[in-house]
Amino acid sequence: ARKHLIKTNVESLQKLYPRAEIVCTITDTYGNIADAVNDENRKCIDYIYTAMSELGIKPNTIAMRGGTDGSYISTQGILTPNYFTGGHNFHSNCEFLPLLALEKSCQMTLKLIELIAKG
């Protein structure tokens, strides 16, 4: 929607100032993991919810950017969904990770390995 708005604004400016050369080039540099989800790779997300259920963790699903590596890899066909770390105040000088959250995140990782190994 934002890209369309920008292009529409450029077109409006071109009509308003026909002698001006106005060029707009939009290049995607950061993909959305959600755009990469399909029926073929959805299983890895299902594993996350199964692991959380088996560990008694209540999911709180939110849309978020997961970092450039994961976003790029996902757009290349290898889905890399995020699951919790339990951290707080990300990318600030007050960022912290409670020990209990670290423990749960570690249990989650081990449970995912177990589920994936079972198939």
Residue ranges with predicted function:
Residues 1-119:
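Metal-dependent amide/peptide-bond hydrolase catalytic core
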